[in-house]
Amino acid sequence: MIDGDGYRLNVGIVICNNHGQVFWAKRYGQHSWQFPQGGIDDGETPEQAMFRELYEEVGLTHKDVKIIASSRHWLRYKLPKRLVRWDSKPVCIGQKQKWFLLRLECDESKINMQKGSSPEFDGWRWVSYWYPVRQVVSFKRDVYRRAMKEFASLAMPFRERKLKGKKVKRRG
């Protein structure tokens, strides 16, 4: 679905583990990495689209994860002009995304990128929480930063949150 402003309705998915790391996926046949994401079909809610994309791209179901949060607002990015398909109707100039933070509740061996009809990814790894913001393609960077900032306090392991909340005495 494309909205009246030319943005494709989409979901972004951040999967975290119990160590505060996030799932980082390598795009099929490319050297670029990103979070799982995908379009919202007509008649689908963002949550339904998220679970469909999660299964198609990562092979996980609603039983394998727990929803920790979803973004308060839709986050948008524009595509570089060279990536816009000007001959398509309607023209899509970017993505309008609802983001979800999930916690993996199953063994990571259940991750299977071959479940969908055409795989989106051919590799993955756990990375530190803020790593994706520095590594994602530049036109997605601001949306990643905003989503990750919104989810940060919920994704960090409890111990790290507790330490960050302590006041530090200054000397001198």
Swiss-Prot record:
GO molecular function, one term: mRNA 5'-diphosphatase activity
An annotated GO cellular component: cytoplasm
Presence of the UniProt keyword Nucleus in the record: no
Motif Nudix box per record, residues: 38-59
Top-level EC class: hydrolase
Keywords: Hydrolase
SUPFAM superfamilies: Nudix
GO biological process, one term: mRNA catabolic process
Cofactor section: a divalent metal cation
Domain (Nudix hydrolase) ranges: 6-149
EC number from the UniProt entry: 3.6.1.-
Matching Pfam families: NUDIX
Family in the record: Belongs to the Nudix hydrolase family. RppH subfamily.
Function in brief: Accelerates the degradation of transcripts by removing pyrophosphate from the 5'-end of triphosphorylated RNA, leading to a more labile monophosphorylated state that can stimulate subsequent ribonuclease cleavage.
PANTHER family, alphabetized: M7GPPPN-MRNA HYDROLASE
Xref: HAMAP family: Nudix_RppH
Name of the featured protein: RNA pyrophosphohydrolase
Organism: Vibrio vulnificus (strain YJ016)
